[in-house]
Amino acid sequence: MTQIVHLSDIHASSAHFLSDVAERVIQSVNEIAPDIVVVTGDLTQNGTYPEFADAKEVIDRIDCENKVIVPGNHDSRNVGYLFFEDFFGARNSCHPLDGVTVVGVDSSQPGIDDGHVGRDLYDWIAKSFETDDFKVFALHHHLIPVPMTGREEQIPVDSGDVLELLGRCCVDLVLCGHRHVPWVWRLNEMFVVNAGTACSNKIKARTTQCYNLIEIDYGDLRIYRVLPGGEQELVIDRVMSP
C-alpha cells in the first residue's frame, strides 16, 4: 500500500498562519508516516524570502523523503517564484516513486491570481505519464469549480484542455488546492481532489483546517479528510478499474 498526504495553502509567516495548528498537522502527518507528501501551493502569503524560509522550516519538519511541492498564486507574488526555486527546486517536476508517478506543475502566473498551465507543458506532461504506474497530477489551481466557495473565479484558463489531456493520459488522481474548501469530484475514471487550507485562518463558512490522506492499495483507492489533530473521515472508498 502507498500512502500520500496532500497538504495545501499553508500561508506561512503571514497574519493568517496558525502556528499551533501547524504543529498539530506536522505531528499527525509524522504519525501517519506517508510514502509521499504532496504540497499544492500557497506556501506563503506574499512570496517573500522570509515567508519561504518559514515555509521551508515547516515542510522540512515533516518526516518523508518523497515530497512533491508546487507553487501557488501567492508564491508567485513579488516575483516570488524565484525564491520558490531557491528553496524547493523546479516548479515543474516528475517523480516516479515505486508504482506511483506524480507530476507536479506550476499553474501560477506572476502578478495575477488566475490559473494557467500552458500549451508548452502539454507534451512534457503526456511524456511523463507514459507509464503503467498509478498516475497523480498535482497543481495549485482547481480544475473544476468547488461548491461553497462563492462566485467562481481563477480556475485555469485552459482547464478544459488540461482535463482532456489528463483523461487521454489515463490519469487516476488530480490533487489541487487554492479555494480552501475540501472537495472530491469524479470525472469518468479520474478523481479530482481539492484540499482545504492546512494551517491558516483563511477558511470559508463551516469548513475548518484539514488535509487529505490517499491510500492506494493494489486495486483499491481510499481518500480520507484529516483534521489537524489526526481525526480521519473516509470520503472515497472504491475499487479502481483494472
Give the location of each predicted region.
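Active-site neighborhood of phospho(di)ester-bond hydrolases with catalytic His/Asp-centered motifs
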Residues: 7-8, 36-42, 67-73, 106, ...
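Conserved beta-sheet core of the metallophosphoesterase superfamily
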Residues: 151-220
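Short acidic, glycine-rich surface-loop motifs adjacent to enzyme active sites
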Residues: 131-148
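Beta-strand-turn-beta hairpins that frame and shape the catalytic cleft
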Residues: 1-5, 94-104, 130-136, 186-192
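Active-site environment of divalent metal-dependent phosphoester hydrolases
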Residues: 13-16, 45-50, 73-81, 110-113, ...
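Extended active-site neighborhood of metal-dependent phosphoesterases/phosphodiesterases
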Residues: 49-127, 131, 161-167, 212-213
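A short C-terminal boundary segment appended to hydrolase-like catalytic domains
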Residues: 217-242
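N-terminal active-site segment of His-dependent metallophosphoesterases
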Residues: 1-58
